[in-house]
UniProtKB/Swiss-Prot annotation:
Acetylated; acetylation impairs nuclear localization and ability to transactivate expression of target genes. Deacetylated by SIRT1. Phosphorylation at Ser-64 and Ser-211 by PKA increases transcriptional activity and may help delay chondrocyte maturation downstream of PTHLH/PTHrP signaling. Phosphorylation at either Ser-64 or Ser-211 is required for sumoylation, but phosphorylation is not dependent on sumoylation. Phosphorylated on tyrosine residues; tyrosine dephosphorylation by PTPN11/SHP2 blocks SOX9 phosphorylation by PKA and subsequent SUMOylation. Residues 63-103 are annotated as: Dimerization (DIM). One of its GO terms (molecular function) is cis-regulatory region sequence-specific DNA binding. Its main location: nucleus. Residues 105-173 bind DNA. The gene is SOX9. This is Transcription factor SOX-9. A motif (9aaTAD 1) lies at residues 275-284. Residues 56-67, 160-174 have a biased composition (Basic and acidic residues). Changing residue 158 to T: In CMD1; 17% of wild-type DNA binding activity; shows a 2-fold reduction in nuclear import efficiency; transcriptional activation is only reduced to 62% of wild-type activity.
């Protein structure tokens, strides 16, 4: 049994002073953790150590008895920690429990603790600057990396310790002691974590509280970031803040952002796609697009993102309207106010032509017909339309915005564009929004007219009809009679063809 002598000594020392081990974690483990490594005493039912240790080891063990660990353990540790000097300092015996009336009986070490105790001493000697916590982390990682053969010596030693412990303390019951110091630290850490968790929620709530003012309830539902961002813009649901959009960037943002933020229907490609990117072929083919299909993809609110754009560009205005539709009055009014001032007089004349279109528009969306009458001064129309989410605005929008040329012209003439926006806004603010975007995209292709080809040919005329464009074009507005887009709708409404589907969708909201 000379083989076991070192083990016995080690066990006694561990029982007396495991707490004195260099690392508090070790003492904690030994006293408190049944089986940190998962290979605890329960799983180590075999006691093969006596047989497994080579016969020649006793001599080595005797030599290293001062190390308090059998050679097999030391060899295993040194294998894992290759290159370390294997001079284990004698285990400091801190008589924690012995001083008390009843000396505290520590639980037998499990395999991991056996490994950690031996390896920690070695590492601590070699790297005295290492913090115990770092040592423990490293030891745990190394232990997980060990294979069964490498763990066997520790497992066997742990089993031996368990059996010995049972002999020494037959009545032993595990009664974990409260570690006040540890508990306090843990409690503090827990509190800190709780605080960290709470603070985000509080922030989120605060954001939500603010968000209702800036954005609709939907935006509130979205992440706090959106709320804060939207506070800048109209109340439209999850649309991009108006302030964010710059005239140049408005197209991309409207098209791209509205879907993610406000577009509940991410499927809409047009929002994400800059029509400018589309080839003229694609645009020309777009004519064949069913407006209703487009509407499907447009959010019922219109493009929430639209509000983001200010009346910067006509199509922007239209978008604004759509977003106005979403946020109907506030965004729409803002757009209107901006756009109305310059264009109202010119728009009024064009509005007369739109009125004719309005009747055809009813085909698209009867609810929106009323909007056509609002065509009065754009300012009025815009405001009215904005307030009349979708119906009137959509109607007008169809009439005016459908033609890509209109957009391109608007792009060319920013002031006129503003006028267009208001005009479109009144008609479409809610209803137009989906189309506005598409148109907007098309606008990006000023060749979008091909996209609207029916509207495009008419578009120029259409916009011409609108004072927004050149007066010459205004007359053409009536000619907009391109029915290619909307055969059912009068030629004038060819742009409306787009709008009609929009009406359906806009009306839905």
């Amino acid at each position: 049994m000379n083989l076991l002598d070192p083990f016995m000594k080690m066990t006694d020392e561990q029982e007396k002073g495991l707490s004195g081990a260099p690392s508090p974690t070790m003492s904690e483990d030994s006293a408190g953790s049944p089986c940190p490594s998962g290979s605890g005493s329960d799983t180590e039912n075999t006691r093969p150590q006596e047989n497994t240790f080579p016969k020649g080891e006793p001599d080595l063990k005797k030599e290293s008895e001062e190390d308090k660990f059998p050679v097999c353990i030391r060899e295993a540790v040194s294998q894992v920690l290759k290159g370390y000097d294997w001079t284990l300092v004698p285990m400091p015996v801190r008589v924690n429990g012995s001083s008390k009336n009843k000396p505290h009986v520590k639980r037998p070490m499990n395999a991991f603790m056996v490994w950690a105790q031996a390896a920690r001493r070695k590492l601590a000697d070699q790297y005295p600057h290492l913090h115990n916590a770092e040592l423990s982390k490293t030891l745990g990682k190394l232990w997980r990396l060990l294979n069964e053969s490498e763990k066997r010596p520790f497992v066997e030693e742990a089993e031996r310790l368990r059996v010995q412990h049972k002999k020494d303390h037959p009545d032993y019951k595990y009664q974990p002691r409260r570690r006040k110091s540890v508990k306090n630290g843990q409690a503090e850490a827990e509190e800190a974590t709780e605080q960290t968790h709470i603070s985000p929620n509080a922030i989120f709530k605060a954001l939500q509280a603010d968000s209702p003012h800036s954005s609709s309830g939907m935006s509130e539902v979205h992440s706090p970031g959106e709320h804060s961002g939207q506070s800048q813009g109209p109340p439209t649901p999850p649309t991009t803040p108006k302030t964010d959009v710059q005239p140049g960037k408005a197209d991309l943002k409207r098209e791209g952002r509205p879907l993610p933020e406000g577009g509940r229907q991410p499927p809409i490609d047009f929002r994400d796609v800059d029509i400018g990117e589309l080839s003229s072929d694609v645009i020309s083919n777009i004519e064949t697009f069913d407006v209703n299909e487009f509407d499907q993809y447009l959010p019922p609110n219109g493009h929430p993102g639209v509000p983001a754009t200010h009346g910067q560009v006509t199509y922007t205005g239209s978008y604004g309207i759509s977003s106005t539709a979403a946020t109907p009055a506030s965004a729409g009014h803002v757009w209107m106010s901006k756009q109305q001032a310059p264009p109202p007089p010119p728009q009024q004349p064009p509005q007369a032509p739109p009125a004719p279109q309005a009747p055809p528009q009813p085909q698209a969306a009867p609810p929106q017909q009323p909007a056509a009458p609002p065509q009065q001064p754009q300012a009025h129309t815009l405001t009215t339309l904005s307030s009349e989410p979708g119906q009137s605005q959509r109607t007008h929008i169809k009439t005016e915005q459908l033609s890509p040329s209109h957009y391109s012209e608007q792009q060319q003439h920013s002031p006129q564009q503003i006028a267009y926006s208001p005009f479109n806004l009144p008609h479409y603010s809610p209803s137009y929004p989906p189309i506005t975007r598409s148109q907007y995209d098309y606008t990006d292709h000023q060749n979008s007219s091909s996209y609207y080809s029916h509207a495009a040919g008419q578009g120029t005329g259409l916009y011409s009809t609108f004072t927004y464009m050149n007066p010459a074009q205004r007359p053409m507005y009536t000619p907009i009679a391109d029915t290619s887009g909307v055969p059912s709708i009068p030629q004038t409404h060819s742009p409306q063809h787009w709008e009609q589907p929009v009406y359906t969708q806009l009306t839905r909201p």
